[in-house]
Amino acid sequence: MRKLPAIKPRQIIRFLEQHDFILDHTTGSHYVYYHPTSRRRAVVPQHNRDLPKGTLMSLLREAGFTRNELIDFLSGS
C-alpha cells in the first residue's frame, strides 16, 4: 500500500472536479461537492494548510475513492 502524501484542499478539489463532482454550495469555510449520478457528497475544508491524513481518508471514503486513485492522480498517471 502506497503512502498518502500531504496535500492541500485545492488539490483534492481538482481531483473531485476531474471526476465530475460539482460544487453544490459553501457553508462557512467548507465547500460541498456532489456527483450528479452517484449522488455522493464530499465536504472539503477551504484553507491553505495540508489536510490531516484522517480528514483526507474520510473525504475519499465519502466520495467513493481509494487512496491509490488519489495517488495515481497526483503522480500524473
Regions from the PLM with identified roles:
Residues M1-T27:
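N-terminal first-folded block
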Residues R49-S77:
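C-terminal structural segments of small proteins and small subunits
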Residues I22-G54:
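A short, structured beta-strand/loop element
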Residues F15, F21, Y33-Y34, F65, ...:
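Aromatic side chains
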Residues Q11, P36-R40, M57, N68-I71:
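Short amphipathic alpha-helical patches
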Residues R2-P5, A42, R49, S58:
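Flexible, active-site-adjacent loop/turn segments at secondary-structure boundaries
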